[in-house]
Amino acid sequence: MRAVLQRVTRATCTVEGRVTGATGPGLLILLGVAPEDTPETAWRLAAKIVKLRVFADETGRMNRSVQDIGGGILSISQFTLYADTRRGNRPGFSGAAAPEHARALYAEFNAALRAQGVAVGEGVFGAHMMLDLTNDGPVTLFLDTAES
């Protein structure tokens, strides 16, 4: 799995004019799923993300997690994180999981986040989504479970 995390003051996902998910202060997560990913991968990544200390403490140092601040998460499925741009000018996506597999693991990932007490808003899997967010920092991190 690959995840792009952005620390946000707010984020909203809209599909066809309808808000499907939102968060106040917290994280926006763009999640990509690979064919070899499993439910265990989803739970491990979720556990890592909710404990990452990317929010400022009283001294201004990044020392608090999304759990610590009582923040929320907006989780968005994004197969394009597995784009291969090495050849030509059109990205290939053969490194991304098949839609059925990715949909199941996206749901598992969101369940794992919720199981750790974090409020989670969601996008709509496979839909064309409009994201509106305010980055905080900005702080943007890239996590890849294949590298852990």
From Swiss-Prot:
Keywords from the UniProt entry: Cytoplasm, Hydrolase, RNA-binding, tRNA-binding
E.C. number: 3.1.1.96
Key word Acyltransferase present: no
Family: Belongs to the DTD family.
Gene Ontology cellular component list: cytoplasm
Functional note: An aminoacyl-tRNA editing enzyme that deacylates mischarged D-aminoacyl-tRNAs. Also deacylates mischarged glycyl-tRNA(Ala), protecting cells against glycine mischarging by AlaRS. Acts via tRNA-based rather than protein-based catalysis; rejects L-amino acids rather than detecting D-amino acids in the active site. By recycling D-aminoacyl-tRNA to D-amino acids and free tRNA molecules, this enzyme counteracts the toxicity associated with the formation of D-aminoacyl-tRNA entities in vivo and helps enforce protein L-homochirality.
Keyword Nucleotide-binding (UniProt): no
HAMAP family attached to this UniProt entry: Deacylase_Dtd (MF_00518)
Pfam families documented for this protein: Tyr_Deacylase (PF02580)
Domain statement: A Gly-cisPro motif from one monomer fits into the active site of the other monomer to allow specific chiral rejection of L-amino acids.
Cellular localization per UniProt: Cytoplasm
Protein's UniProt name: D-aminoacyl-tRNA deacylase
Quaternary organization: Homodimer.
Main localization of the protein described in the UniProt heading: cytoplasm
Record field: catalytic activity: glycyl-tRNA(Ala) + H2O = tRNA(Ala) + glycine + H(+); a D-aminoacyl-tRNA + H2O = a tRNA + a D-alpha-amino acid + H(+)
GO biological process: D-amino acid catabolic process
Motif Gly-cisPro motif, important for rejection of L-amino acids mapped to chain: 137-138
Enzyme class: hydrolase
Entry-linked CDD domains: Dtyr_deacylase
Lineage summary: Bacteria, Thermotogati, Deinococcota, Deinococci, Deinococcales
Gene: dtd
